[in-house]
Amino acid sequence: MAMRSHYCGLVTEALMGQTVTLAGWVNRRRDHGGVIFIDLRDREGNVQVVCDPDRADMFKTAEGVRNEFCVQVKGLVRARPEGTTNDSLKSGRIEVLCHELNVLNPSVTPPFQMDDENLSETTRLTHRVLDLRRPYMQRNLMLRYKTAIQVRNFLDKEGFIDIETPMLGKSTPEGARDYLVPSRVHDGQFFALPQSPQLYKQMLMVAGYDRYYQITKCFRDEDLRADRQPEFTQIDCETSFLNEEEIRAIFQRMVTEVFKTQLDVDLGEFPIMTYQDAAFRFGSDKPDLRVKLEFTELTEVMKDVDFKVFSGAANMQGGRVVALRVPGGARENGGLSRGEIDAYTEFVKIYGAKGLAYIKVNELAKGRDGLQSPIVKNIHDAAIAEILKRTGAQDGDLLFFGADKTKVVNDAIGALRLKIGHSEFGRKNGLFENVWAPLWVVDFPMFEYDEDDARWVAVHHPFTSPKDGHEDLMDTDPGKCLAKAYDMVLNGWELGGGSVRIHRAEVQSKVFAALKLTPEDARAKFGYLLDALQYGAPPHGGLAFGLDRLITLMTGAESIRDVIAFPKTQRAQDLLTQAPSPVDEKQLRELHIRLRNPDAAKAA
């Protein structure tokens, strides 16, 4: 007989009265009054199997099965008795009366209960094979698969061609650290694993393929966080002869269709916000628009106040002073407690802030006397009036302040905005709206100044085109040069980022010069690109989405590791296979590598 006729989770009333053959794992075995019930599980879900003692051989086998045994069942689909249906399961109105039961493979006792929702991540990743059997992980990975299929079908209909690019390439250490692969054949030389197929896809446009995509692995040797992995999956796309707006329109439509099909969610319109506006209002280039709090700009107001923390920042080159109004934060009942304010003060220090000044607005009608804060006495009446006017403060509001270098203020108060918005207080007081909030952030700076290296560096990458009319600023004022770059943001996460690329060799050389790359360095690192651009390179641009992030958002997973089958930990380790691991001396000799501290490598 066939090993299986149907998936467990797909056995429904439509199969009533039919004989089915199922294969899967014992999720649970229950003995009720001489009748054994087995919940049989596969990737599609569970089905209840009833083992009656009338069939002695089968029943004896059923008595011996335990959780996670791999078994095969042949039986009759019938309705569950009245009062025993389970509408939470597709198969919840039927059961399978077992005629034959075969143990395909027994299981040792698992190290944890499969329905335990409080497992540590270490336990889950160490026993990942078992963890992947759990419905939570199977739902996540099935959604990932269905999303990838839909993306492929969409791009195929739009004329995009799936072309693979090399995994072993040239190291160009301009951004994050590369993962390096030593060459056995070429002593002392190294390949790099791709951080992105960026230059290959641009050269495919020069080669005339017009529209390219691939769903591919990329690698970055960087410090890991909840939304980072050393290897990650990218939906990588490039297209020729389209402008920025046309490129954005294609991929907005793609994401909109994915959410509608997979989640039945209508994302609606995508507002377009400039980078400058996003940083000014929210302190972030990926604002979470679900949080209903915004910065109030106060730099000019604070230039002549006696409170040196404010006036010092306001008069500092590159300094900024802002307020964050928290409606209801100072209410006598239901406002933020002193302990919560102290906790927020410590929180902003993580982002470089030295502290967190605040004013409680108790009674506006009393003017200065209606405000509660140790800083009020050092702020003159005109500044107080302007603070209250600009923030729109009402009785019971709490005003937090950030004053420092612009980056510190944006990072610290931006993080505080999210912390308060997502808190229990924020949700109870209407500061958070539980919706999907997409937007495009556009007009990014072309360059940012790296104080450690004392030079300008590319904000996105050095192949991004400057906005029309901004090319000359690369020579005169790089900080004011804007790029044809755009990010798709959803709920505070960057889903995808891209740009119109430079397609003229002389402009590309100009960017390299602005980055303090000598012509010799530029040719050594990127000569193949500069050469390609001279052969009639078309205007082109593209975008790359992080598939892992996209699925994390769609599933509501707490960590990106919950949507990847075999992820690395935050220490870049695979706990299942114990990678990375030492290699033997012969392998190292073949690669012309000698370890400085071999004992440390063995002990790691």
Curated annotation (Swiss-Prot):
Its EC number is 6.1.1.23. Its main location: cytoplasm. It is an enzyme of class 6 (ligase). It holds the Pfam family tRNA_anti-codon. L-aspartate binds at residues 174, 220, 460, 501. Transmembrane segments: none annotated. One of its GO terms (biological process) is aspartyl-tRNA aminoacylation. Keywords: Aminoacyl-tRNA synthetase, ATP-binding, Cytoplasm, Ligase, Nucleotide-binding, Protein biosynthesis. It catalyses: tRNA(Asx) + L-aspartate + ATP = L-aspartyl-tRNA(Asx) + AMP + diphosphate. The record marks 32, 83 as: Important for tRNA non-discrimination. GO terms for molecular function: aspartate-tRNA ligase activity; aspartate-tRNA(Asn) ligase activity; ATP binding; nucleic acid binding. InterPro entries: Aa-tRNA-synt_II, aa-tRNA-synth_II, aa-tRNA-synth_II/BPL/LPL, Asp-tRNA-ligase_1, Asp-tRNA-ligase_1_N, Asp/Asn-tRNA-synth_IIb, AspRS_core, GAD-like_sf. It is found in: Cytoplasm. Residues 198-201 are annotated as: Aspartate. The keyword Secreted does not apply. GO terms for cellular component: cytoplasm. Belongs to the class-II aminoacyl-tRNA synthetase family. Type 1 subfamily. Homodimer. Aspartyl-tRNA synthetase with relaxed tRNA specificity since it is able to aspartylate not only its cognate tRNA(Asp) but also tRNA(Asn). Reaction proceeds in two steps: L-aspartate is first activated by ATP to form Asp-AMP and then transferred to the acceptor end of tRNA(Asp/Asn). This is Aspartate--tRNA(Asp/Asn) ligase. It comes from Paracidovorax citrulli (strain AAC00-1) (Acidovorax citrulli).
